[in-house]
Amino acid sequence: MKQFVQRAGGRIGLWGGLLAAALAAFAAGWLVPARAPVGCKLNELTAAPDFSPFSPAAPAVATSDAGTPAAPSLPEKWVCLTLDDGPSKTTPEVLAALDAAGVHGTFFVVATGYNEKYLPLLTQAAAAGHQIALHSASHEYSDIYRSSAAYWKDIALLKQRIAPYVDAESIRYLRFPGGSTNTVSRRYGGKGLMPQLKTEVEQRGWQWVDWNVCAEDAVGGHPSADTIYRNVVRETGEQTHCVVLMHDSATTRTTAEALPDIIRWYADNGYTFLTVAEALPLG
């Protein structure tokens, strides 16, 4: 590249053009923020033998590779389709795909201020039978993982912002940004923060929810719908109890395109679609 610029007579117009193109791509949602990949694949973060996507306090509905039998009321094979980081301009397409298939999903929502105009979609999603769960107000790791107090302040702000659209006080399911085994929290709150937060969630009678299938739809490069579909099929493998991580943010529009094929594959392979609350009912 240095030689190319020198041959071009030292002009910087090329760099200005590249910068302008990159900024335009980011604005259009084709470039994914650097924080998005954190926590996508739990087994790449910390060793998690006998991994279950649910809190330890959960009933016996752990994943099949954990060797824990399903609760009697649950089907032999089930899948929870979960979507993080919405609502956004992508959410109507996601809802349309789910509704067309007669399938209910679970939305772990954010309320960053940037997506404020899409928050009314939560009312529509809840009315259609989809589950609304908590994710983060800001999704800024450096803010929410400074301390336990900072994390719960963020959750309180999230509930406040979504309260006009859903019954926020009744929500008892959440997903930690980056997942429960994320390592990014250690940079800001220390090694003991995540164990503390998990304990505090359980003490409230809530459940935190991870995943055991990652669509890898937010790992950068704007993966195609076909790539997302193949990622889900590959990661599902022989598992019979699946919690699938996907996103309905403005930067993951191809996830909505992939959903019909993902749903069809699970249906063809004998899976029953559940919300997280159906797979993990709380008393």
Q: Language-model segments: what does each one mean?
A:
Residues 139-245, 249-267, 271-272, 278-282:
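Catalytic domains of cell-wall/extracellular-matrix polysaccharide-remodeling enzymes
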